[in-house]
Amino acid sequence: MFVATALALGAAVLHTAWNLRVKQSGDRWLALWGLFAAGGIIGLPYAVVATVSGDLGWSAWGWATASGAVHAFYIGRLARTYEVADFSVTYPIARGGGAMFAAIGGVLFLSDRLSTLSMIGILIVVSGLTLLAGHVDWNHVGPALVVGLLIGTYTVIDSKGSRSTVGSAYAMAIFVTGGVGTTIQGLARRRWSEMRASVPVMWKQYASTGLASLVTYWMVLLAVRRAPVGYVTALRESSVVLASFIGWRILKEGSGVRRIVASTTMVVGLVTLVVGR
């Protein structure tokens, strides 16, 4: 259990860290593009081997491609939201809202069933979101909710895709298609010259954040093999509380105590949602 605890908490810290790095970047979209491009390059050999061995079929690649397209929109919206909204607002709402939207999407599109306890969990999450949004400009809350909706959308797609493959190969495919999708988005936005020019200067950040994102996934995967999913989720989603604390103490954002209480409420709701499934 100690190993699972360390892995889950480590994943929470890593996920918060790379999001904070993006928030503090001068060009948030470029930072996110570099993250996914680097993650795709790192994950490509694994995905190729899994495809050749048959562990990663064409059906899974189809779902991964759809997920990559949604990720491209997600990256664009997340970058824009980090430009206009506080870190301690965007991150908790996006993460909490994403899990809530994913649960609802699972019922609508994957024939999942929610128990009474899970529905109570959703209500608790909504309460936390309401508390967090209560004294925040809607121009900040709205974009964060859109990010959460996109997270919920690609989570539902990935849930379907992961059921059609073996092991963690699908996660590598997501990074590959996400990197391709984001690159195509950059080309469509006529940012190729900026993307190319940023690589010699920013490649260390791109590689470190891309690797951190991949390692985050692996740590959660290893943790759930050693401990109950609900326990791991509780520790993993503690990242929303950590983000609120960082926003308050490091980034000097306002309403720190209120945002920490709201984020903690969302964690309780998310854990209740998972345990009730």
Regions found by a protein language model. Name each.
Residues 66-71, 80-126, 171-179, 229-249:
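Specific alpha-helical transmembrane segments that line the substrate/conduction pathway
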Residues 74-75, 102, 154-155, 213-217, ...:
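Functionally critical, cavity-lining and gating residues within the transmembrane helices
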Residues 10, 33-41, 93-101, 119-120, ...:
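Short hydrophobic alpha-helical membrane-embedded segments
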Residues 219-277:
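C-terminal appended segment following the main domain
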Residues 1-69, 73-87, 134-145, 176-226, ...:
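Membrane-interface interhelical linkers
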Residues 139-172:
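Selected transmembrane alpha-helices and immediately adjacent juxtamembrane segments
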Residues 37-43, 100-107, 114-133, 258-277:
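Hydrophobic transmembrane alpha-helices of multi-pass small-molecule transport proteins
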